[in-house]
């Protein structure tokens, strides 16, 4: 926070972020997360047939982060592992996940499992975006008969050409960002994905010869068919606005619904483009959504709120938060809807169904203890001056490295990166 010119309390309050983190690079994150997944779940490395990484934190314009992670499979002799890196801002992890699921469902599947990794570090220059920076990595095992399953037919996407956030300058990690436009793009995307999801869901339920889609029966409003939601989280405030936007879409579809009785008729007359930034719409529906948000979304906000924007890992950090904040018995049979967004832009909304116990996942994740155990250091202690440098060995200053965590040990004279693990 002290990197920012604004007073810490003011900025933290306005964007609703609590704590931020810094760490070496996306490769060390991925190595740590995948090795942890293999170790904690006693997974035989030979059982993995696909590994794909979603990231925008590239350390090399040619060599993939996935290729660095292959070090973990050398001892087992398993070099027959498909997949590389997927890049599109914060959306790469979701595209990697879709690819893994498609692989398991395809004729190319050989019976083994897949691992999906979302690993990123977000960095910004001076300005309003800097306090939202963060870092994180999530590794996921994908295979048949999982306790959390994709729901067929419940997915919608929205893709467009925008310049809301991009990184054309390869001499710096800082993006070019139009904050106001980026928020508009995000809100536009969440609405478009919701509409596309609903349209595809309707077709899927019609194919099953159901009388009508379940989003029209048994709920106060269609949004209630989502038991829980996890959003890509640049800031917690944007997540709140986005959930409210979904309720606004429900209102437009059925303004006569009694839950919208207090909504002024004039709101229906606001033109679409203007509605994306209309403060009266935002305020009205954030107020209406408050109770639902606390029940359906708030349990998923802990990690993004405490770790800042983790780019491709952000929405899956939200999923981890949900698994650790809602017990397995409560989650069983529930629908978890995910909204993933990456600037430029690519976005999708899809649903998962909890059909088995999530208790072991929560225990292995151990989110609450790990967040509390973090070491607070000053920005000066983690400020790195090694970007684009060779013949470099990182020096201490950011606290001790925990056991089983990988870190960058050296960049040699040919820019080859060496990682070591703390035993």
From Swiss-Prot:
Q: Which superkingdom is the protein from? A: Eukaryota
Checking SUPFAM superfamilies in the record gives: Thiolase-like
Known Gene3D superfamilies for this protein? 3.40.47.10
Q: Kindly indicate whether the keyword Transferase belongs to this entry.
A: yes
Q: Which CDD domains match?
A: init_cond_enzymes
A Gene Ontology molecular function term for this protein is: hydroxymethylglutaryl-CoA synthase activity
Any single GO BP term: farnesyl diphosphate biosynthetic process, mevalonate pathway
Which pathway or pathways does this protein act in? Mycotoxin biosynthesis
Sorted alphabetically, the keyword list is:
Transferase
Q: What is its EC number?
A: 2.3.3.-
Add the further remark from the entry: Gene clusters encoding host-selective toxins (HSTs) are localized on conditionally dispensable chromosomes (CDCs), also called supernumerary chromosomes, where they are present in multiple copies. The CDCs are not essential for saprophytic growth but controls host-selective pathogenicity.
Outline what the protein does.
Hydroxymethylglutaryl-CoA synthase-like protein; part of the gene clusters that mediate the biosynthesis of the host-selective toxins (HSTs) AK-toxins responsible for Japanese pear black spot disease by the Japanese pear pathotype. AK-toxins are esters of 9,10-epoxy 8-hydroxy 9-methyldecatrienoic acid (EDA). On cellular level, AK-toxins affect plasma membrane of susceptible cells and cause a sudden increase in loss of K(+) after a few minutes of toxin treatment.
Family from the record? Belongs to the thiolase-like superfamily. HMG-CoA synthase family.
PANTHER family in the record: 3-HYDROXY-3-METHYLGLUTARYL COENZYME A SYNTHASE, HYDROXYMETHYLGLUTARYL-COA SYNTHASE
Protein known as? Hydroxymethylglutaryl-CoA synthase-like protein AKT4-1
Species this protein is from: Alternaria alternata
